[in-house]
UniProtKB/Swiss-Prot annotation:
Alphabetized HAMAP family for the sequence: HisF (MF_01013)
One MF term in the entry's GO annotations: imidazoleglycerol-phosphate synthase activity
Cellular localization per UniProt: Cytoplasm
GO biological process per UniProt: L-histidine biosynthetic process
Pfam families referenced in this protein's UniProt entry, alphabetically: His_biosynth
Catalyses which reaction(s): 5-[(5-phospho-1-deoxy-D-ribulos-1-ylimino)methylamino]-1-(5-phospho-beta-D-ribosyl)imidazole-4-carboxamide + L-glutamine = D-erythro-1-(imidazol-4-yl)glycerol 3-phosphate + 5-amino-1-(5-phospho-beta-D-ribosyl)imidazole-4-carboxamide + L-glutamate + H(+)
Protein name: Imidazole glycerol phosphate synthase subunit HisF
Quaternary structure, from the entry: Heterodimer of HisH and HisF.
Top-level class of the enzyme under EC nomenclature: lyase
Gene this chain is encoded by: hisF
Alphabetical list of SUPFAM superfamilies matching this protein: Ribulose-phoshate binding barrel
Domain of life: Bacteria
Family: Belongs to the HisA/HisF family.
Length: 257
């Protein structure tokens, strides 16, 4: 069995790490490089960096920090933000990232997923999906441009359908960002994860809602996700990654120690 991954997520804006609640009201957490280093030393399996305003600003990730991160950590890391072409992706991978993640640009141009998978291999291509549960319709809807409160909007895709579509096009991994749970720390949306897991044949990463160690265990045991991504519990030192891994091991969950 493959070890379950613990993945701190660093939202980046203007060269600093920030964190919001339900994709709004972001506060500054600190500088990128020291945080990345701290998480790698604590035992993170991987890091994900989202340049949260790149897509809505119509630019690509600010690459200056990508190479600085690559110099100080020895675990894989993934970078997302405004990657609209193979050239954009190539530059980020050249700067030292192991994977690129695309979200809004994939919705605007689904062919991009295939182009990137063909050029760099599916193992490098992650598709991020921002999924919002609409209580009125009872449906999970995919949103885009979620890094900018003014521009964020629903797409025509329902989450489950988009999960199937991106796999057909060559996504090697899916990060499901559950918007209703984001930053609230009440636990992952297990029901939604199970719905997606049924149709997701590639590695699935849960994102949004981690508030306690048992929330990670639940996502692994009840929804069989491959990795769990979290931000505020790590940034605010509510949970230490080393201690989390010991706890998961005691629960009988395979992790890399």
């Amino acid at each position: 069995m493959l070890a379950k991954r613990i993945i701190p997520c660093l939202d980046v804006r203007d060269g600093q790490v920030v964190k919001g609640v339900q994709f709004r009201n972001h506060e500054i957490i600190g500088d990128i490089v020291p945080l990345a280093k701290r998480y790698a030393e604590e035992g993170a399996d991987e890091l994900v960096f989202y340049d949260i305003t790149a897509s809505s600003d119509g630019r690509v990730v600010d690459k200056s920090w990508v190479s600085r991160v690559a110099e100080v950590i020895d675990i894989p890391f993934c970078v997302a933000g405004g990657i609209k072409s193979a050239e954009d992706a190539a530059r980020i991978l050249e700067f030292g990232a192991d994977k690129v993640s695309i979200n809004s640009p994939a919705l605007a141009n689904p062919q991009l997923i295939t182009d990137l998978a063909d050029k760099f291999g599916v193992q490098c291509i992650v598709v991020g999906i921002d999924s919002y549960y609409d209580k009125e319709t009872g449906k999970y809807q995919v949103y885009q441009f979620t890094g900018d409160e003014e521009r964020t909007k629903a797409t025509q895709w329902e989450t489950r359908d988009w999960v199937q579509e991106v796999q057909k096009r060559g996504a090697g991994e899916i990060v499901l960002n559950m918007m209703n749970q984001d930053g609230v720390r009440n636990g992952y949306d297990i029901e939604q994860l199970n719905m997606v897991r049924e149709v997701c044949k590639v590695p699935l990463i849960a994102s949004g809602g981690a508030g306690a160690m048992e929330h990670f265990a639940e996502a692994y045991q009840k929804a069989n996700v491959d990795g769990a991504l979290a931000a505020s519990v790590f940034h605010k030192q509510v949970i230490n990654i080393g201690e989390l891994k010991q706890y998961l091991k005691q629960q009988g969950i395979e992790v890399r120690l």
